[in-house]
Regions:
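Positively charged, Gly/Ser-enriched RNA/tRNA-binding surfaces
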Residues: 17-35, 46-47, 70-71, 80-94, ...
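Auxiliary tRNA-acceptor-end handling modules of aminoacyl-tRNA synthetases
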Residues: 1-18
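Acidic, His- and aromatic-enriched active-site or binding-groove loops in soluble protein domains
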Residues: 61-70, 175-196, 287-289
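Short, conserved phosphate-binding/catalytic loop or strand-edge motifs used
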Residues: 118-124, 160-168
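Polyanion/phosphate-binding surface patch
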Residues: 40, 44-74, 117
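Short, surface-exposed recognition loops or helix-turn segments adjacent to catalytic cores
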Residues: 155-164, 182-183, 265-270
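Phosphate-rich ligand and nucleic-acid binding surfaces
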Residues: 12, 169-176
């Protein structure tokens, strides 16, 4: 007999987890659409050269790649941004610019597993391609803000930076040739100790005193205006770096004008993003109560990525919700719904002789927009109610043989165990209205 098991970093989702994920996906879809983003899809498998064109040595090591039956080198997508750049280059003549898309799909990375990090996970991306307008950068931050609010997260922080600022600091320090390695090292702040990051930079040829200054800069915190003022001297006269500072100031002004609460969006000079394709604004979002969980929604501007696949310039900006990490965080905080069913009403199967009546009642409740599960067997009442409570139904509707004769029904609130008698006297519409009203009252209490 084969032992049922899953690979390390891969997992099954039980109903409660899958339902919680679907709920967040529905919210993300609604928020993305409210800003005009349209859905697309791309293959899970791409030519390997598509995926490795603008990654990094670290990303390449994490790729699941192989030679297929046609002797082609192929790989599983490690994110949704690179396939989108290929997609845009291939279809831009049809799409037009600027083009706004969202994409929710599974990706694969052969990385070390840890809390909230898996080798197979889902990303929920949205991107705008074909414009360098700072409005697109601003909108990206606003979508992230609105999404986290809609999910019901009350305490979160969006941390922003600009890769041009970091580049300017490095050029002013004479480290332009080592910028890629230094940025990757800075991206590990918060995941590794300050000394470990300094040592790693030293391994890339950065003098220890310069490495400490860079780490000190990355650790700056406080009001955005003060952080930018402290970074400005480090950028010096570097024109591109000053463009980055101006871009962050413009972004913060827009965030304030859009009505985002003060303190929700802060400047964090350590935010670099590990992927090499980012060129401008970058952002990461954190649960304030679980800062060590890592970013739950990240992204930024990538103006050159599509240039790997087309001569047409297609600058882009976007972000991705890491739904699996977010779910892990919500579960740790005890804020994840535990219901194992999408249905709210459990219709008890009390008497097989009334099967037709039960089916008509269930159909009428569903036609009214309610979600209903009818138990398939006429088991003992206590047994059915115990199962209904375990699975997380809101109410159980009990109509027995004698109850059919009297024209009444029992509606049991499975959370409080309170029971309400409904006098419907064979009027199906009256029964539906009564159940609907009770459900609305229960929902409003939650």
């Amino acid at each position: 007999m084969i032992e049922p098991r899953t690979l390390k970093g891969f997992r099954d989702l039980l109903p409660a987890q899958a339902l919680a994920r679907e709920k967040i996906l529905d919210i993300a879809r609604r928020i993305y659409r409210s800003y005009g983003f349209a859905p697309i899809d791309t293959p899970a498998l791409e030519y390997l050269e598509i995926l490795t064109g603008k990654g990094s040595a670290e990303t390449d090591k994490q790729l699941y790649s192989f030679t297929d039956h046609g002797d082609r080198r192929v790989g599983m997508r490690f994110d949704l941004t690179v396939p989108f750049a290929r997609f845009a280059a291939q279809h831009i003549a049809t799409l037009g610019t600027p083009f706004k898309r969202y994409h929710m799909a599974t990706v694969w990375r052969g990385e070390n597993t840890q809390r909230g990090r898996y080798r197979e996970f889902m990303q929920c991306d949205f991107d705008t391609i074909g414009t360098t307008s700072p409005v697109a950068d601003l909108e990206t931050v606003l979508v992230v803000h609105d999404l986290l609010v809609a999910i019901g997260i009350k305490r979160f922080t969006i941390r922003v930076n600009d890769r041009r600022i970091l580049g300017g600091v490095l050029r002013s320090a004479g480290l332009a040739e080592r910028s890629t390695d230094v940025l990757r090292s800075l991206d590990k702040l918060g995941k590794q100790s300050l000394d470990a990051v300094v040592d790693e930079m030293a391994g890339h040829g950065v003098p220890a005193d310069v490495a400490r200054r860079l780490v000190a800069m990355a650790a700056l915190a406080g009001p955005p205006a003060e952080v930018l003022a402290a970074v400005e001297p480090l950028v010096g006269d570097d024109a591109v770096g000053r463009e980055g500072i101006a871009a962050v100031r413009t972004l913060l002004d827009g965030v304030a004008q859009a009505g985002v609460a003060e303190g929700r969006v802060v400047v964090d000079p350590s935010i670099a993003r590990g992927l090499d394709y980012y060129t401008g604004i970058v952002l990461e979002s954190f649960l304030d109560e679980l800062p060590t969980l890592g970013s739950i929604c990240s992204g930024g501007r990538y103006d050159d990525l599509a240039g790997l696949y087309t001569k047409q310039r297609l600058p882009g900006v976007g972000a991705s919700l890491g739904i699996d990490r977010l779910l892990a965080g919500l579960e740790e905080l005890g804020r994840l719904a535990t219901a194992e069913t999408p249905a709210e009403v459990f219709l008890v199967h009390f008497d097989a002789a009334h099967l037709g009546d039960y089916l008509r009642i269930a159909a009428a409740l569903r036609a009214d927009g309610m979600t209903v599960e009818f138990f398939p067997e006429a088991r003992r009442l206590g047994q059915q109610l115990k199962l209904a409570a375990k699975k997380g139904f809101r109410v159980a509707l009990v109509i027995g043989t004698d109850v059919f004769a009297r024209g009444t029904a029992q509606l049991k609130n499975l959370a409080t165990e309170a029971t309400t008698t409904i006098a419907w006297e064979g009027d199906l519409a009256a029964l539906v209205d009564a159940v609907h009203s009770h459900l609305e009252a229960i929902r409003s209490d939650h």
